[in-house]
Amino acid sequence: MDPVPGTDSAPLAGLAWSSASAPPPRGFSAISCTVEGAPASFGKSFAQKSGYFLCLSSLGSLENPQENVVADIQIVVDKSPLPLGFSPVCDPMDSKASVSKKKRMCVKLLPLGATDTAVFDVRLSGKTKTVPGYLRIGDMGGFAIWCKKAKAPRPVPKPRGLSRDMQGLSLDAASQPSKGGLLERTASRLGSRASTLRRNDSIYEASSLYGISAMDGVPFTLHPRFEGKSCSPLAFSAFGDLTIKSLADIEEEYNYGFVVEKTAAARLPPSVS
């Protein structure tokens, strides 16, 4: 019988035997009756009146891919070796307890991320009863044991907790401060820094005829010892006695007639005898 399509329920994480006179192990639920409604107590006899219930435990979380799930169930003869990869189902409170003298139940546990199919449910019935949609494993203790297999769900990655630094980078509007508040705090920080600067600092002196400095608007200043000579104030006093000359004044002052050159060029070269 092929596995049925996956269901919304979680796969089984384990099976265990529990004495009928005691509560099931923590995290397990007991199969107390068959599909027909008859009591489902194993091993009940004159020597052992309480008997045992088969208990199931479902996988609680899909976040851990290494969490084991029940991949298969088999019924084997008590004295025969267990199939490869299988382990016996036992009573957690009494590992030596014997449920059946002839047979024993064993399960194959695999990590959730390493199996394609898993067991999702187990039911008990009389030997002549058929349970639709379930695969018959075998007979034990006067009952027919059925299991329902389905496609194993894929592990769900566990969400990571964001640190405060990462939350600061989040685009979630609910966790971000308002734009107006952010601008106000930024302006406040820049204002407090700019208030420590003085207009007579060399970086704010006029470095051109327009009085605009490359440092205007920069919210920090260099330490004086890192300022070079090029940052010193410009001495405009050197231009105080500047005389503006006309074209005629320049031609008169720098007029040169080239008389010597012309005289030398006019001389005849000496004759060669």
Swiss-Prot record:
GO annotation (BP), single: ubiquitin-dependent protein catabolic process via the multivesicular body sorting pathway
Subunit structure of this chain's protein: Component of the ESCRT-I complex (endosomal sorting complex required for transport I) which consists of TSG101, VPS28, a VPS37 protein (VPS37A to -D) and MVB12A or MVB12B in a 1:1:1:1 stoichiometry. Interacts with CD2AP and CIN85/SH3KBP1. Interacts with CD2AP (via one of the SH3 domains). Interacts with TSG101; the association appears to be mediated by the TSG101-VPS37 binary subcomplex. Interacts with VPS28. Interacts with VPS37B; the association appears to be mediated by the TSG101-VPS37 binary subcomplex.
Localization terms from the record: Cytoplasm; Nucleus; Endosome; Cytoplasm, Cytoskeleton, Microtubule organizing center, Centrosome
The UniProt record lists the keyword Phosphoprotein: yes
Entry protein name: Multivesicular body subunit 12A
PTM field: Phosphorylated on Tyr-204 upon EGF stimulation. Phosphorylation is required for interaction with CD2AP and CIN85/SH3KBP1.
Lineage: Eukaryota, Metazoa, Chordata, Craniata, Vertebrata
Protein's organism: Homo sapiens (Human)
Residue numbers bearing the Phosphothreonine modification: 130
